[in-house]
Amino acid sequence: VNSKKNTSFNFADDMYYGDSNYVDWKSGNYTEKGLGTGNSLYIWQPAYQGIRHLSVFLNNIDMNKEFSEPEIADMKGQAHFLRAYCYWMLIRSFGPVPILPDEGIDYTKEYDEIAYPRNSYDECVDYISNELVKAAMLLEEARGPQDIVRPTRGAALSLRSRVLLYAASPLFNGKAPAEVIAALVDKSGKKLLSDTYDERKWAIAAAAAKDVIELGKYQLYVAYKSEGGSSLSDPATITPPDDEGTFHSNPWPKGWQNIDPFKSYRALFDGEVSAYGNSEIIFTRGTNQGAENIKVMVIHQLPRSQGGGYLSLIHISEPTRPLY
């Protein structure tokens, strides 16, 4: 769970689902920075700040004498992952963006000397993909509970898979509207978005997805069937209706006969399962961090007259109120 609002680096998508500024968003009353520093469009500045910090780190970490070689290697992997992630957030929001030199920029120079043009979308994808390969080669395969928020090899390969899937999709693979392709041309006449379809991009994306699958580390979380305990926190499993086939009579993973399908889904969102215990998580910011954690989100879903709920656009519907 991320938040009841987006953050600049939401791990899901770029949809805005906050409650307090819905009218402004719907009416288009926002700038290129979004509706404030807590919203999904406020990405440009923090992303490039992060890229600069990460480049400085990568260019200087080898001078450190306090950390061991394995520790330095892992930190380098994290830095390559995060630099790729920052660029991913940028191209997801703005399309082709400038790729800055890995050695960094001398900000004491005049603006014209350090103003870099936009790279093409394919160039951005290639850079991000290469960064994630470097990260995957250095990162650990798994993290302990105290380091659950740090990226792993699976996180790097998964992000690479998503980036390459987007690159293969029609909008970025020669199928964008002609007026969009024509508009994405820099001052030198360089096309920033390809107008040529390339079937190979799908093969590359499929191979990247296979790299993740072959790790064998991720699977759906399931809660097993219960006859019910002595407390309300352990209710008996509500048996789903029979399907037309044999799924209802087969044990997991070929059916739901021995699991609780509803609880398997519910437990992922009500705080019952920790980030460390969730076998579906690939990259996470942790469990219940910040002021807008699961407890607060639940309160926002309650009616104001029931249990001290807050004003929110995600309140339960009126017919459901008697259940509270």
Across the structure, where does each feature detected by a protein language model lie?
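An aromatic- and glycine-enriched ligand-binding surface/loop that stacks and positions planar moieties
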Residues: 1-18, 97, 154, 165-317, ...
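Conserved, well-structured interaction surfaces
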Residues: 17-94, 111-148
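Short, flexible loop/turn elements at secondary-structure junctions
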Residues: 103-106, 143, 285-289
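Short, conserved phosphate-binding/catalytic loop or strand-edge motifs used
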Residues: 102-108, 180-183
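Short, small-residue-rich loop/turn micro-motifs
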Residues: 101-106, 132, 167-169
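TPR/Sel1-like alpha-solenoid repeat signature
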Residues: 80, 157-163
